[in-house]
């Protein structure tokens, strides 16, 4: 290799500096890959390439990593900084073997044998010029842009045409000390490491580019030849008394309506547009957990992303983030309502496939869609769908629609060999563009049909939207899930493949709820959500600035010292910083008087801000319930607090998709935190410290509306134990409306009929709606709920129930 200060390399670096734009994956290798700056480091690359090393040199200079041009000097030993598995491919003839790599690696291992204190980190580095996966029928393009083994001439063309799409990916370091100690230092281990490295680089390329893309028409013909679709076409012809040719044409129409038409060229163009858009909209996008997803891809998993659905922006945000995190944007299941011109064709070429809201018993459409989904899984394309079925209008997660999850499960049951893993994704925003529209819809206004004019209208309103949040939750591998739920599932299916197992529907329901729980486990507590939570807990949605900052400091400390889960992310900075962020986003207003500053939510924005509060209400609902127990009792035993929370937790879990593994332990951790912060003292019982009562009262207010709902339900059940589920839902809803009118409750979810439906299902499951119900349990929970209400609210509920049911 020429010297790094030679005229040739200086010229090459100058050319690349003007032609090449490099994206680094991950963005911070030290933090994400646990690199140790104190230990010597060498880079491992697949192929020797001057242009690749020049691109790597630019990146290492920016990241503060050793330059690939500098020799590795460790304990008096001088070695190359870059080790390549294979030499450059000449324009004609064959490339040299891997002997130089083996010799270099043997030298490094020999040094470790001689010097026990030495530990060199080997960091694999992959470079990609463009990320086109190629098509099954590629010809000329593949010949010109052969990416696996390009000659220097092809590499020049790649830099010229694809230089703006250069990716450098760092992988986890390998300790040579560990290799030498565990596996020895002979030539055999050198050969083994070379094989492992080749497999690693091959897998990394698959993760970065994805599988080859099929010709769309060839895909259709392949699907139509499948046994299940041929059978469905025959049944369609028989049932509708049409010819099989006509039924086949209908199936082709369905395929054309459904199938994506992924275009790498469009994705590259969209990447530039979205980069401009995100920079215009957001001051930053916070990402947590991407490394675990990259590892799943690397390990050969079929990935299904299941994000929550807040906004139409969700379709763009997740794909953009995955692209920049070195993964292929997924094929996205989009509602057929988004298939309007010109957005529909663009979404389709960006990887969207379209699904009808309801299959309406259309067996042929169902068979076509299922076969298409199976094909995506079989060919290794990652998939994304929204299990809620639509955007949340309240900020809370919606009850999951199980159709797509059931079809994914059926694909596994039909014999996909690779592990299929659902990756829950929490998407959050400091500003959701549709919030105002959502609340108009909740107040009864008819939902507008999506059109291009709505898109232009949204773009017209672009402004400072703060930050976005993408948190990847705990993955769920379906084969492992099935092993837990039905250990003999493989045997059962082998014995009778056509028979639907009795355990399948319950298993799908459990899985859907686990996905939603894992999404909420990965919530992002931001400046807007936290400040909304505090201000909406006050009577006038306003608080003195210093008190607001103090309350936010308490919440931040709680989330860090008693973390909800390891997947949850918490805003950086202190309460003062969070308040300032919210003010800069114009989410809150501040006014000054002689006694200080007051931060508030404008009356016109109060309902809208409940949306952001509801994004994270589940993180604080149990601490809030504990605070309510403490502030409504002068003294209370610790065990009584644990018991009260245990009684309400099943309903909270059903309503808010909570996943606290050990509720008593969590309650005790929160109580210990309150004691540590000086809010509570404990002798034989727990007592609130008077000067901190206001902080606990503010925290307790966050659960008040939830307790009011439970008080309504259990007062009704105590008054009429034999009440039917449908009757309980309707009467609870009517009583909630009365309570809201009398006490000024404006939160949309308080009047949500679906929420009362969810609670009634859980009540039946818990035995509270059974004929042989234990009335003492109902009375106990009613009394507990009543005891935690304001006297005026309690009086309204009790009087209304008594008046309604007095005979």
Curated annotation (Swiss-Prot):
It comes from Shewanella baltica (strain OS185). The HXXXXD motif is essential for acyltransferase activity and may constitute the binding site for the phosphate moiety of the glycerol-3-phosphate. It catalyses: sn-glycerol 3-phosphate + an acyl-CoA = a 1-acyl-sn-glycero-3-phosphate + CoA. It is an enzyme of class 2 (transferase). Its EC number is 2.3.1.15. The keyword Cell inner membrane applies. InterPro entries: GPAT/DHAPAT, GPAT/DHAPAT_C, GPAT/DHAPAT_LPLAT, GPAT_PlsB, Plipid/glycerol_acylTrfase. GO terms for cellular component: plasma membrane. SMART domains: PlsC. It is found in: Cell inner membrane. Pathway: Phospholipid metabolism; CDP-diacylglycerol biosynthesis; CDP-diacylglycerol from sn-glycerol 3-phosphate: step 1/3. This is Glycerol-3-phosphate acyltransferase. It comes from the Bacteria. Belongs to the GPAT/DAPAT family. A motif (HXXXXD motif) lies at residues 308-313. Keywords: Acyltransferase, Cell inner membrane, Cell membrane, Lipid biosynthesis, Lipid metabolism, Membrane, Phospholipid biosynthesis, Phospholipid metabolism, Transferase. It is a peripheral membrane protein. GO terms for biological process: CDP-diacylglycerol biosynthetic process; fatty acid metabolic process.
